[in-house]
Amino acid sequence: MTASADIRLSDVRFSYGETAMHFDVTITGGEIAAIVGPSGSGKSTFLNLIAGFETPQSGIISINGVDVTHLPLADRPVSMVFQENNLFAHLTVEQNVDLGRSPNLRLNEEDRKAVASALARVGLQGKEKRKPEALSGGERQRVAIARVLVRERPVLLLDEAFASLGPALRHQMLDLVNKLRRETGMTVLMVTHTPEDALHLDALLIFLDNGKIAAQGPATEMLSRAGPEALRHYIGEMRSF
């Protein structure tokens, strides 16, 4: 079981182009949070700061009480899944997951058992020897999630990981992630352009606007008629397209 880890961004400031971003928030360990907001509002930057792809100009980022602000990406207790390019095309499903245990693909018996267990948990038994090109989009993302499991990091970041999937398949993947979160205790942050995903998961919803956290709260409250006006306006604009 993966230990839960709080995530704290304390007065974190970062500039991207002409957008000055400011984040001050705590995500409780074991929670699932959905990050929503207009394009350019800072959603991916928010995740990149936590993952270590970006370094804040000021402020502190801590995970489980440990300051990781200047910790190298590889040393952070974080796994990240993107919409595309999560897998190596020349490796099999099994080998892609093996990388989560050993970058040189040298696994011991315990590692192999962990990989087999992860593939079973995401429903990929019998597909271990296939290459990514032989998989559907949903199956490829399941491989990426299996690799997350064998890495045993307490924080999972999803940057629009399921955006290219249809609604039914996207919900299947969200349900899988939520099931694994409950089993492992990991903290999950996901960027999505579909606020209803947060409702589907009964998640914490964090609404970003112009590089700042404009509102946050339980999705059931945030997406109700009594929710923040800025969020209602954003959703209304989305549905007008």
Swiss-Prot record:
> Which UniProt keyword terms apply here?
ATP-binding, Cell inner membrane, Cell membrane, Membrane, Nucleotide-binding, Translocase, Transport
Where does this protein come from, organism-wise?
Answer: Brucella abortus (strain 2308)
Q: Which family does it belong to?
A: Belongs to the ABC transporter superfamily. Thiamine importer (TC 3.A.1.19.1) family.
- What superkingdom does the record give? Bacteria
Q: Does the keyword Nucleotide-binding apply?
A: yes
Principal subcellular localisation of the protein: membrane
Which PANTHER family does the record cross-reference, listed alphabetically?
SPERMIDINE/PUTRESCINE IMPORT ATP-BINDING PROTEIN POTA, THIAMINE IMPORT ATP-BINDING PROTEIN THIQ
Q: How does it assemble?
A: The complex is composed of two ATP-binding proteins (ThiQ), two transmembrane proteins (ThiP) and a solute-binding protein (ThiB).
Q: How does it sit in the membrane?
A: Peripheral membrane protein
Pfam families on file:
ABC_tran
Q: Name one GO cellular component term.
A: plasma membrane
Role played: Part of the ABC transporter complex ThiBPQ involved in thiamine import. Responsible for energy coupling to the transport system.
Which reactions are catalysed by this chain?
thiamine(out) + ATP + H2O = thiamine(in) + ADP + phosphate + H(+)
Q: Which GO terms describe its molecular function?
A: ABC-type thiamine transporter activity; ATP binding; ATP hydrolysis activity
Spell out the disulfide connections. none
Its protein name is Thiamine import ATP-binding protein ThiQ
Q: Tell me which InterPro entries the record gives.
A: AAA+_ATPase, ABC_SmlMolc_Importer, ABC_transporter-like_ATP-bd, ABC_transporter-like_CS, P-loop_NTPase, Thiamine_ABC_ThiQ
What Enzyme Commission number(s) apply to this enzyme?
7.6.2.15
Q: Does the keyword field hold Manganese? A: no
All copies of the ABC transporter domain together span: 7-235
Q: What class of enzyme is it?
A: translocase
Binding residues for ATP, per the UniProt record? 37-44
Cell compartments where the protein resides = Cell inner membrane
